Amino acid sequence: MKLTSFENDNENVLHSYIFSQQAKPHAAIDALFSALLPFGKPFIVQPGEEFSLYTEQSTRIVLLESGIFSICRSDRGLNVLSVFAPSLAGLIDSYGVTYDVPTRPEHFLIAETECRGRAVSLADFIKVTDECNLWHDVARFLAYRLMVMNVRDRELVGVDSYLKVRALLIEIAAYNDEDR
């Protein structure tokens, strides 16, 4: 039986940030934005400001039109993922609310740059997605997000500190000058 070593796995794969930009399902995002933007409430969030996915009335789906934000866990503030426009956020939290998942994960957003977008109520999101038959596009976006998380985990889980710092430096170097 041959054992495969994964020690240098990071040497032979595309970095998660570069992968996330190249694999982004633009057609699915465009279809979702086209149908949902008219139902969203516009927002602008400045760098360092938090944006809640929850209001007293509803959970919100965020359509990020410009900027970069971090998705953070509400319980510990742990940064889960950085998201670059165009993108969506709030699908996981909305699923938890819709299906009353006990001890569901909750998240909030922190703007890394000025962020502009629209916040769509969960009720409007479900209604429009049903009426416009957009669930395939939602599934494509969620599959994309899972792939990005998988690639990112390969860089961060089970590796030494050097490889984690190296992955972060590669990511920062790949950013556009204005985002860096």
What are these regions (language model features)?
Residues M1-E49, S87-A89, S94-Y99:
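Cyclic nucleotide-binding regulatory module and flanking cytosolic helices
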Residues F39-K41, G67, N79, P105:
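Residue-level marker for the onset of beta-strands and adjacent loop->beta junctions
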Residues G40, S58-T59:
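Short loop/turn microsegments at loop-to-beta-strand junctions
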Residues K41, E50, G67-R73, R116-G117:
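Short beta-strand segments in beta-sandwich/barrel cores
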Residues E50-Q57:
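Short phosphate-coordinating micro-motif centered on Lys-Gly-acidic
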Residues T59-G77, F84-S87:
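Glycine- and acidic-residue-biased ligand/ion/polar-headgroup-sensing regions
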Residues V80-F141:
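Cyclic-nucleotide recognition modules
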Residues N133-R180:
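Polybasic "coupling" helices that flank or enter modular domains
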